Amino acid sequence: MQVLDNTAHPDRQKKETSAGALYDLIAPKKEMVKPVGQYNKVRIISKSGHIEHWLNCFKLLEYDFGSSEIKSIISKSKFRDMPLFAKNNFGRIGFQGDHGEVWYRNIRIREL
């Protein structure tokens, strides 16, 4: 799930790279990000390959890992030449910020 300042960062101009998106693949249904300086409440639910992105109590998007739809989207993306992209349904969780300071708090990971 993309974490981004939708008011200032150049990636905001493309919906698929705006806050809440499945980065560069699926755009959020609506912009629900709070202004800079306020914390957003994020929930990512992953159960049996079904993924949901929630931002500030609004479901932004959902998809099924391994579905023909997601495979088609990936096949047309910059990730198509990465053979392991979206192949594992277990592993480590990473937080990445390559566009300035990013702050997180109250991170909880629960098994469903």
Say what each PLM segment does:
Residues M1-L112:
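Carbohydrate-interacting regions of secretory-pathway proteins
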